[in-house]
């Protein structure tokens, strides 16, 4: 088989006190669903995270590289990399690999002096956003985000909005499904929400 595991919807939202990153858990090969338990949101450091939409192998490869670079940076300067620095590093890696491109789109979120969110395309183009989505179901997620997002949204409302956006994509996009991974990054650090916590918010 020449096709690769791919397909997903990722969402990022800047809230008053932090950033929300969320993604579905389905991995597909062509028209086949191969897994409903794939993780697509990853912690890079205490206040840094990344979500990937696209080819699973490429996402995991980049995550390993970014984690190593973040550890090296911390060892050299005795502090954590800024969110913008992580986004720039990700962009540089993607841009330098244009001849053998990563088949993925990334959302970088984190908290340094404030919550920040960046989207980075496969060629390395970077955009700072208040909210964004990527992947095969992004247009359905965007419709929910654009209608309901507001500046200064409280973190719990941002979590609920991210879940609604992923749910909208799940209903309409065959490559999105299998549950949700959702994390928040605040001044206190990185936190992955449990399935029970997310379910209670939707009740």
UniProtKB/Swiss-Prot annotation:
Q: Which residues form the propeptide?
A: 1-7
Reactions catalysed, as given in the entry = Cleavage of peptide bonds with very broad specificity
Cleaved signal peptide residues: none
Q: Which domain of life is it from?
A: Archaea
GO CC annotation: cytosol; proteasome core complex, beta-subunit complex
| E.C. no | 3.4.25.1
Q: Where in the cell is it found?
A: Cytoplasm
* Gene Ontology biological process terms in this record: proteasome-mediated ubiquitin-dependent protein catabolic process
Q: Which residues catalyse the reaction?
A: 8
Gene3D superfamilies hit by this protein:
Glutamine Phosphoribosylpyrophosphate, subunit 1, domain 1
Q: Which GO terms describe its molecular function?
A: endopeptidase activity; threonine-type endopeptidase activity
Q: Which UniProt keywords apply?
A: Autocatalytic cleavage, Cytoplasm, Hydrolase, Protease, Proteasome, Threonine protease, Zymogen
Known activity regulation?
The formation of the proteasomal ATPase PAN-20S proteasome complex, via the docking of the C-termini of PAN into the intersubunit pockets in the alpha-rings, triggers opening of the gate for substrate entry. Interconversion between the open-gate and close-gate conformations leads to a dynamic regulation of the 20S proteasome proteolysis activity.
Q: What does this protein do?
A: Component of the proteasome core, a large protease complex with broad specificity involved in protein degradation.
Q: How does it assemble?
A: The 20S proteasome core is composed of 14 alpha and 14 beta subunits that assemble into four stacked heptameric rings, resulting in a barrel-shaped structure. The two inner rings, each composed of seven catalytic beta subunits, are sandwiched by two outer rings, each composed of seven alpha subunits. The catalytic chamber with the active sites is on the inside of the barrel. Has a gated structure, the ends of the cylinder being occluded by the N-termini of the alpha-subunits. Is capped at one or both ends by the proteasome regulatory ATPase, PAN.
Q: Which family does it belong to?
A: Belongs to the peptidase T1B family.
This one is known as Proteasome subunit beta 1
State the species of origin. Thermococcus kodakarensis (strain ATCC BAA-918 / JCM 12380 / KOD1)
């Amino acid at each position: 088989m020449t096709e690769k595991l791919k397909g997903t919807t990722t969402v990022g939202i800047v809230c008053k006190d932090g950033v929300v990153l969320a993604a579905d858990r389905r991995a597909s090969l062509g028209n086949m669903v191969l897994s409903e338990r794939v993780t697509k949101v990853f912690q890079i450091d205490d206040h840094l995270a990344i979500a990937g939409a696209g080819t699973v192998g490429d996402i995991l490869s980049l995550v390993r590289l970014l984690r190593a670079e973040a550890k090296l940076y911390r060892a050299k300067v005795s502090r954590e990399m800024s969110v913008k620095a992580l986004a720039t590093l990700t962009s540089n890696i993607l841009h330098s690999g244009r001849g053998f491109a990563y088949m993925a789109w990334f959302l970088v979120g984190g908290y340094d002096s404030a919550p920040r969110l960046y989207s980075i395309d496969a060629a390395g183009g970077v955009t700072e956003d208040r909210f964004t989505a990527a992947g095969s179901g992004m247009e359905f997620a965007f419709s929910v985000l654009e209608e309901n997002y507001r500046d200064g949204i409280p973190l719990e409302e941002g979590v609920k909005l991210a879940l609604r956006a992923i749910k909208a994509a799940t209903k309409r996009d065959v490559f999105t499904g299998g549950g949700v991974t959702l994390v928040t990054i605040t001044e206190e650090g990185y936190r992955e929400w449990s399935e029970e916590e997310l379910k209670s918010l939707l009740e």
